[in-house]
């Protein structure tokens, strides 16, 4: 069995939201904890949580989880790429592959991770290096990258994340389908926040 870790990107500035969305309370927990909990429930190790301006709050809200490694990205204002590079650097040589999670997607269930891992085990030997969930025909996160691609993250810049790597290696990508589009829901705007509150009771026990 390959060793698979996780990077959870939690250093965003929430410019479109106007407030730190990852600390918003949902079901008695800050929003980012749902991605963390999904990664831990799936047995991913190591798990790296990359934070920025609100790093101390991230530490406080994960103090019960010894397995979480928190990395401070002091260059968080430059965009997502700097956080992703910091996470990859922390996991180089320690994992065979890594999931890249967005910290504002609270509805991704562990079954998504399980199915992607099963696909990785089955198809890596056939040359597939990127595995992505496809929620009701829309590609989403978390994305699983094989360690063979880690060096390429050194070239990414700004807010692109891993997009350029996905495009470059699209022929080596496998999309794993899921019917539920809400599993891939993320929060960027106040309108998204309203939708979040509307659909959350279906997935999260409210407190």
Where are the regions that the model predicts?
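Hydrophobic residues at beta-strand termini and immediately following loops
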Residues: 26, 71-73, 133, 176-178, ...
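Conserved alpha/beta core of the MobA/IspD/sugar-nucleotide pyrophosphorylase nucleotidyltransferase superfamily
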Residues: 2, 151, 155-207
